[in-house]
Amino acid sequence: MKITQEEVTHVANLSKLRFSEEETAAFATTLSKIVDMVELLGEVDTTGVAPTTTMADRKTVLRPDVVEEGTDRDRLFKNVPEQDNYYIKVPAILDDGGDA
């Protein structure tokens, strides 16, 4: 499957990333090779091979779900430079408001 430069540019724009034309071409080529390799793996005959659901041989260890007293909100906001109604204000990082 061929990944086009237009697709790379589209995803980059959604991610608020900018690449040169050379970088976009390189990404398209590399991603196409990755997708081709994954498709090739789909052709492997796995008849008689037991499905693998996890690679970890450890059991998941869960902690008890216990309510604990948290840190006081006023104490948490003591060193916050700018806030509004217990929301921390930070500088904008997206030029156009951030809508994808």
UniProtKB/Swiss-Prot annotation:
Broad class of enzyme this protein falls into: ligase
Gene Ontology terms describing biological process: glutaminyl-tRNAGln biosynthesis via transamidation; regulation of translational fidelity; translation
Catalytic activity: L-glutamyl-tRNA(Gln) + L-glutamine + ATP + H2O = L-glutaminyl-tRNA(Gln) + L-glutamate + ADP + phosphate + H(+); L-aspartyl-tRNA(Asn) + L-glutamine + ATP + H2O = L-asparaginyl-tRNA(Asn) + L-glutamate + ADP + phosphate + 2 H(+)
Keyword set, alphabetical order: ATP-binding, Ligase, Nucleotide-binding, Protein biosynthesis
Protein name: Aspartyl/glutamyl-tRNA(Asn/Gln) amidotransferase subunit C
Keyword Iron-sulfur: no
InterPro entries per UniProt: Asp/Glu-ADT_sf_sub_c, GatC
Species of origin: Streptococcus pneumoniae (strain Hungary19A-6)
Subunit structure: Heterotrimer of A, B and C subunits.
Molecular functions per Gene Ontology: asparaginyl-tRNA synthase (glutamine-hydrolyzing) activity; ATP binding; glutaminyl-tRNA synthase (glutamine-hydrolyzing) activity
Signal peptide: none
Family classification: Belongs to the GatC family.
TM ranges: none
Pfam families linked: GatC
